[in-house]
Swiss-Prot record:
Function in brief: An essential GTPase which binds GTP, GDP and possibly (p)ppGpp with moderate affinity, with high nucleotide exchange rates and a fairly low GTP hydrolysis rate. Plays a role in control of the cell cycle, stress response, ribosome biogenesis and in those bacteria that undergo differentiation, in morphogenesis control.
Source species taxonomy: Bacteria, Pseudomonadati, Pseudomonadota, Alphaproteobacteria, Sphingomonadales
InterPro entries: G_OBG (IPR031167), GTP-bd (IPR006073), GTP-bd_Obg/CgtA (IPR014100), GTP1-OBG_CS (IPR006074), GTP1_OBG_dom (IPR006169), GTP1_OBG_dom_sf (IPR036726), OBG_GTPase (IPR045086), P-loop_NTPase (IPR027417)
PROSITE patterns: G_OBG (PS51710), GTP1_OBG (PS00905), OBG (PS51883)
Entry protein name: GTPase Obg
Residues where Mg(2+) binds: 173, 193
GO cellular component: cytoplasm
Originating organism: Rhizorhabdus wittichii (strain DSM 6014 / CCUG 31198 / JCM 15750 / NBRC 105917 / EY 4224 / RW1) (Sphingomonas wittichii)
Subunit description: Monomer.
Length: 345
């Protein structure tokens, strides 16, 4: 499935239906008086967070969403039928932003969360409601309240337990492939990963979701390489695994760049629990590893773990550490086997 983490859509609620202009007509009653009913209410635009989806790709092809207009009123004081609400389903973790992206209008963090986003217009008054002692046969009626409409941005922030960070070619994709069934693309060149990947890791009977974001570069927090978008995906991760390529030209400098970008981005990223690990240790001698570990420990103020995503060396210890930070697994409810396939509407 292709990953898309933002989409712009147009939404419009239903306008209210017009009130009716009608007069009572019965045998032997010459002047029956007005009996036009009110128009029906327009449909609402409702968003709902649904589980089981991690992309906004469907909104690339369906961009306009319009709820049904309310039906017109009728004689005999009959109110028109209300317009049908339009339910738009989004992945859990979706935010709705204003067109200028300056304001978060809604944030869907829980499966099943619903919000009436645009309210349908009220129906117009029928002519019966305009009758007065001086105007017994009114012909005016309400046309119904107009619909609400706007362009909004949908932005998806992945909900994962552990987020992988590091410079390009730090071995993040190899790691997520080694601990899960993510099947992320791996290559011996930077920027092999060009979109976020999710994988479910299982270790000692404990499952947790791992998010692999594309490698960061200097200036990512300000948008370089659209790194600000990628950093947004790890805002909700409970722990970060910072991988440093031990075989790189300057592992210490690589650590400092990523750490600086986390600090610059804000949103509490730099304060999240973090596991720091030297990767690709099978390509470096033990003496060099010891020196690097000491330097990084002094900078990071904590334990520096060692692993090789390619050979699997050190992976169990790193997974143990992640599980220790995550704590006990939350209780989950079994999915309903009769659930319908996902659709944006």
């Amino acid at each position: 499935m292709h990953f898309l983490d933002q989409a712009k859509i147009f939404i419009r609620s239903g306008a209210g239906g017009p009130g009716a202009v009608s007069f009572r007509r019965e045998k032997f009653i010459e002047y029956g008086g007005p009996d036009g009913g009110h128009g029906g209410k327009g449909g609402d635009i409702i968003f709902e967070a649904v589980p089981g989806l991690n992309t906004l790709i469907d909104f690339r092809y369906t961009q306009h969403f319009k709820a049904q207009r309310g039906h017109g009123g009728a004689g005999s004081n009959r109110t028109g039928a209300g317009g049908e609400d339009l339910l738009i389903k989004v992945p859990v973790g979706t935010q709705i932003l204003s067109e200028d992206r300056e304001q978060v209008l809604a944030d869907f963090t829980v499966p099943g969360q619903r919000q009436v986003f645009l309210r349908g217009g009220d129906g117009g008054r029928g002519n019966a409601s305009y009758k007065t002692s001086t105007n017994r046969a009114p012909r005016q009626h309400g046309t119904g309240w107009p619909a609400e409409e706007m362009w909004v941005w949908l932005r998806l922030k992945l909900l994962a337990d552990c987020g992988l960070v590091g410079l390009p070619n730090a071995g993040k994709s190899t790691f997520i492939n080694a601990v899960s069934n993510a099947k992320a693309k791996v290559g011996a060149y930077p920027f092999t990963t060009i979109r976020p990947q999710l994988g479910v890791a299982t270790h000692k009977g404990r499952e947790f979701v791992v998010a692999d974001i594309p490698g960061l570069i200097e200036g990512a927090a300000e948008g370089a390489g659209i790194g600000d978008r990628f950093l947004g995906h790890i805002e909700r991760c409970r722990v970060l695994l910072h991988l440093v390529d031990a075989s790189g030209d300057d592992p210490v400098g690589a650590y400092e760049i990523v750490r600086g970008e986390l600090d610059a981005y804000g949103a509490g990223l730099a304060d999240k629990p973090q596991v720091l690990a030297l990767n690709k240790i099978d390509a470096v001698d033990a003496k060099t590893l010891d020196k690097l570990a000491k330097k990084l420990a002094k900078l990071g103020g904590g334990e520096v773990m060692r692993l090789s995503g390619a050979s699997g060396e050190g992976l169990p210890a790193v997974l143990d550490k992640i599980i220790e930070i995550l704590g006990p697994a939350p209780e989950t409810t079994a999915a309903n086997e009769n659930d319908e396939p996902w659709s944006p509407i």
